[in-house]
Amino acid sequence: MDFRMTEEQELLLDGLRELMERECSEDYIKQCDAEGRPPVEFYKALVDNGYGLLGCPESVGGTPVDNLTLMLVKEEICRLGGPIHALTSMFHVDMMKEFGTEEQ
């Protein structure tokens, strides 16, 4: 299996790095932690920039990507100091696709 990143993956991660730099500074995360609140502005920025439904089918407004791409995004968010719970929904995309229905 070839694990080299595609051009699309590199562009996706470049965009994510720029987003993290703008919306998820270390000071911002510390402030959220001190206030005992989740970083909702960062979550909103992820959604507004197309990362919220990454891995979901286009039919539900998502951007279909493979598991390797999802893992690269998760890894980059963590590497850059982002909140791990920002990734929670990404872990369940495969289960939703496999076991979910249109009605749900």
Region spans (language model):
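N-terminal capping segment at the start of a domain
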Residues: 18-30
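A non-catalytic, amphipathic alpha-helix used as a structural packing/dimerization or gating element
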Residues: 8-19
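Short secondary-structure junction/hinge motifs that connect adjacent elements
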Residues: 27-49
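Alpha-helical scaffolding segments of alpha/beta enzyme cores, especially the outer helices
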Residues: 18, 41, 71-75
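Intrinsic disorder at enzyme termini
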Residues: 1-8
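A generic secondary-structure micro-motif detector
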Residues: 6, 31-33, 63, 98
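Internal helix-loop-helix
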Residues: 48-104
